[in-house]
Each structure stands twice: as structure tokens, then as C-alpha cells.
Amino acid sequence: VSLIQITPPTVLPLHVADVRQHLKQDITDDDNLISLYLGSAVDFAQNLTQRQLVAARFRYVLDEFPCHDAAIRIPRTPLIQVVSIEYTAVDGTTQTVPNADYAIDNSFDPPRITPVYGKYWPYTLDQIGSVRVTFDAGYSAPVTVDATANSISVPAWRPMLVGEVVRMNNSGGVLPAPLAAKTDYYIQSVVSPGVYTLAASSGGAAIDLTSAGTGLNFLGQPGINGSP
């Protein structure tokens, strides 16, 4: 088996300003070096724990499906979404397992995928790398804010529906006003894929964002194994 990161995070989980403050460093001359060390520390921690701090896309490659209805266990958590399960069929063609044919148990650690009742994993060509599971994992994803449109953009997160609960956090600055950390907000509308407005209550009006915030803004969802 093999785990390949195909779309890395666009940002580190901490802003260099927060790390600089922790190091009691007043000048910015060493920011590039600090970022380099931070990136190495993040990689080490993620590989040690098999947990992804900022959302990224992975491909998990197996030589075959588990026997019959046995589970595929996702090796990097927390799982955001399964994008696709592709396999090389016995005739050599690439096929995709329909979403309706498998179930995802995200309450289990590590998350597991099994065929739904009455279904089985398909037969594959007897060669290495015949099964490829593409998935997104991470505790949170970076957010860009359009304060004039009162919208946020979260392209690295799974598509969300109106009414879903989200939380925001920040590193190296402040959240867009009037948003606060450790506070539940609700998807008020889906402006376009990955772009949303937020409400302070379920079914409420869109929050009027009076600033875009500073530093790094992140979005996560309660229940995603400790997201913000």
C-alpha cells in the first residue's frame, strides 16, 4: 500500500508571527528560516500521528480490495470526504465505485469504508496498484474573505449545505469582524461552489462582515475529531 499527497495545504497551520512571538523574536529577518523549521516540525508531527492539521488531498493505493465486504481503513485523519474510489477492472479499464455502493464510518479511528448491505467490492485486475482511494483530510481549511459580499471561500473543504455548523479560528491576526473563535456559525447560503455566507443562528440572516480579518483564517466543523 502507498499513501500519496496529491494536493498539499496552501498554508501552514500557524502564522509565522505567532511562532515569532513564541520564540520571543522581535525582528522579521529570520521569518523565512522560521517558516522552514515550522514546516519540518509540522511534517514530522503529521507523519508521526497520521493526523493532518490543514486540509490536503491524498491518494491511498492498494493492490486489491479487502476480501468481500471487509473495510478499507483510511490512513490519514481526520477524514473530510472521500472523493472517489477507482480500480482497474479485470478487463484493464479504470472504473469508479458508485458513491451509493459504499458507506463511510467517520466515527471510527481510523475511518473505515465498507460496501453497503448487499454489495461487495468488485473484482480487480491481478496487478499492483489496482485500487486507488482519493480523499481529503484535515482539521481545518484556510479561508479567504470577501467582506463586501459578506462571503467566505473555502475551496479545500468538502461542499457544505445550508444549515451546517462551522467554526472559525485564526493564527497571526484577528478573525473577520464580528466573527469569534470557538463559536458555532451556520451556512446561510451557498453563493457558488466553495463560497458561502454565514449566519449566527440556524435560518438566520447573513452576517454582515465588516472586515476581512488579518493573518490566517481557518474553518472547521465540530465533530471532525476536534476541529476548531
Per-region residue spans from a language model:
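Small/polar beta-strand repeat architecture
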Residues: 135-228
